[in-house]
């Protein structure tokens, strides 16, 4: 569950704080688990909600509310992704603006719908879609830049 919290945090310490807050909530709500679905899924949802609440409380989370039409963004080259270490991908995700990163995590990784994300974050469904589209676009540009300049390959060679 630390990995779940870390996707929303800016540092390991912040992720640990989120996780600790989440486990406190889990223990407080343990008697409400109804055995309808997996226990792990229930815990994961509490950790995600705790992380979002933590972000709102401590980082004054702000989202762009500008609504744009979603447009097709071609997928990044699989060669660029394959040549990168997990650490580099995690760093690219952490370098995204907080709003983009949060929506990307909730939609692409946690599997929430844009409607659910809008409700969770207090934004319009269309804003969630826009944030997700922008996050994908920014990640694609950064992946292409890494591939173009060979940064991933150079870093890979220096780790061998």
Give residue spans per PLM region:
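Structural recognition of an alpha-helix C-terminal capping motif at a helix-to-coil junction
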Residues: 3, 17-24, 37-49
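A short pre-motif secondary-structure segment
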Residues: 103-107
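Sigma70-family region 2
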Residues: 7-10, 21-38, 57-59
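C-terminal edge and immediately downstream basic/flexible tail or linker adjoining helix-turn-helix-like DNA-binding
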Residues: 119-122, 136-160
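Short, charged helix-capping/linker segments at alpha-helix termini
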Residues: 2-21, 125, 148-150
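Arg/Lys-rich amphipathic alpha helix in sigma70-family domain 2
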Residues: 31-35, 45-65, 82, 134
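Internal acidic/polar
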Residues: 53, 60-87, 113, 156-159
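C-terminal flanking helix
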Residues: 2, 23, 97, 101, ...
